[in-house]
Amino acid sequence: MHPAKAVLIAPLTSVAIDDANLEAACEWIAVAGYFNAGQDCTAATRVIVEASAYDDVVALLSEQAKNVIKVGMPNEDVLVGPVNNANQLARVQGFLDRVPAHARVTAGGTAIKRPGYFWNPTVVADLKQDDEMIQSEIFAPVITVQKFSDEAQAVKYANGVKYGLASSVWTKDHGRAMRMAKAFDFGCVWINTHIPMVAEMPHGGFKHSGTGKDLSAYGFEEYTRIKHVMTNLNA
């Protein structure tokens, strides 16, 4: 029997350092978080921000959600289409109804009153590590934002969920980025980008985000058996 292989959903983590190009980072994170209404296994829906850049990032992401990201029926100009069905729309509403008192909804937070299952691009700031929206997969156009004080806390927060599919880190300090990438417990780490996939690199998560890999030579290995053959050439 061949072992099962699965790539499962997970809230993807983006860590923003204060020396990053914040405007470019937030523009990219918004696209990576909201495209396909956030219904992608690698969507950038969870953002952890260094304290000194926190207010700027919340403002920039909120601006993207309110005034830049287009919502409607899918076409080349629209990034956010409907969520999958009525049950999923109600599930998203439930998450927003249960936003804790210490958190702020800085953009969106409501369904769109039109035919279909549309949800406004949403930003929820000031969340804590144990909050439901951090520990659960929302699978909708909802980006959550947390604050960290130092690199160790950023890594602790990033890894402190049961999922581990993919993550990204945004900084001009490549040495720091590589150090954090090594510490992240995720099957993929992007640096100063998010979402691009290439056929020659493996894709698959750790922990509850699945088993095995697809893409690349590692993906082929999932469908092969290894056989050892030895011969005595002197016989």
Task: Show the residue positions of the predicted features.
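ALDH superfamily catalytic-core signature
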Residues: M1-K128, I191
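Conserved C-terminal structural/oligomerization subdomain of aldehyde/semialdehyde dehydrogenase
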Residues: H2, A111, F118-A235
